């Protein structure tokens, strides 16, 4: 089972939007050196929506090669087309990804039965790939209910779910209903500590991009049930957990990494660089959390 701090890695870019492969290598090494437990490649934070299929697969492969087995790599291979998701998942499996992250289909708003059949079809098409589901209704306009997740838990290679609802009572109910059949991961930095203390096995984190060591330590403490240490670290990171979402993710976190000297300012349209009026707030959060 993959556990701990799973960074939702940004995809660094040049000002013209081309991928900056050298900066990507630097980020991978930065995370391994600072204790990150796993990397999520080409998810929402990695700008999956604006990478073409060839770039998508190339980026996953590049990260897997750079990691070289040191920590798990989870490949973002979801989509709102089941056929496309199967194709991406198949390619990620060939490249050696340890698992894939499959977002609930967005925009076309399937029913709960449609969601079940979508994830079932991917699992059956790529039976050797461990699959982590991803429910983020704030982005997809489609909410996968706990009952559907419990039903999907019967499929052998579906091994987890990233819960980005931010609803702790609901997440705790899901953990109880699954009874260990799937690992539940937080997908919301601001509430991750509480969900892990309730039994979640890790956090797919935006904040970990800029504070990998502290986030890894928080996840370790929370999973171990050390509430005092979890609360201390959560308080330290809370300014980042809040300010990295002043504009749509990954806009603020890419600017934060730029401010840290880790990457350039490149981001792809329709996303634009962080509004200047928010620069001070993000910089203050970096300082408050001990990053700068």
From Swiss-Prot:
GO BP, one annotated term: lysine biosynthetic process via diaminopimelate
Annotated keywords: Amino-acid biosynthesis, Cytoplasm, Diaminopimelate biosynthesis, Lyase, Lysine biosynthesis, Schiff base
Gene Ontology CC, one term: cytosol
Localization: Cytoplasm
Disulfide bonds: none
Entry EC no(s): 4.3.3.7
UniProt record similarity statement: Belongs to the DapA family.
Protein name listed in UniProt: 4-hydroxy-tetrahydrodipicolinate synthase
Organism phylogeny: Bacteria, Pseudomonadati, Pseudomonadota, Gammaproteobacteria, Pseudomonadales
Gene that produces this protein: dapA
């Amino acid at each position: 089972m993959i556990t701990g701090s799973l960074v939702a890695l940004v995809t660094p870019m040049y000002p013209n939007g081309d991928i900056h492969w050298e900066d990507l290598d630097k980020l991978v090494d930065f995370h391994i050196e600072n204790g990150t437990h796993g990397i999520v490649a080409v998810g929402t934070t990695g700008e999956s929506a604006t990478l073409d299929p060839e770039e998508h697969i190339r980026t996953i492969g590049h990260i897997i090669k750079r990691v070289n087995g040191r920590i798990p790599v989870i490949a973002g291979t979801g989509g709102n087309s089941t056929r496309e998701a199967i194709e991406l998942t198949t390619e990620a499996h060939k490249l050696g990804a340890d698992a894939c992250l499959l977002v609930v289909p967005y925009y076309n708003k399937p029913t709960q039965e449609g969601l079940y059949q979508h994830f079932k079809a991917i699992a059956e098409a790529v039976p050797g790939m461990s699959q982590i589901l991803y429910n983020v209704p704030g982005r997809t306009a489609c909410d996968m209910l706990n009952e559907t997740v419990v039903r999907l838990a019967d499929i052998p290679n579906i091994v987890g779910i990233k819960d980005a609802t931010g609803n702790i009572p609901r997440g705790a109910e899901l953990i109880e209903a699954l009874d260990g059949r799937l690992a539940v991961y937080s997908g919301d930095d601001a509430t991750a500590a509480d969900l892990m203390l309730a039994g979640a096995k890790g956090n797919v984190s935006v904040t970990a991009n800029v504070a990998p060591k502290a986030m890894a330590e928080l996840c370790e403490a929370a999973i171990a049930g050390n509430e005092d240490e979890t609360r201390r670290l959560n308080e330290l990171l809370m300014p980042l957990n809040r300010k990295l979402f002043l504009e749509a993710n990954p806009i603020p976190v890419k600017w934060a990494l730029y401010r840290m000297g880790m990457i350039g300012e490149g981001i792809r349209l329709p996303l634009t660089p962080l509004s200047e009026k928010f620069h001070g707030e993000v910089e203050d959060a970096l300082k408050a959390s001990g990053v700068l």
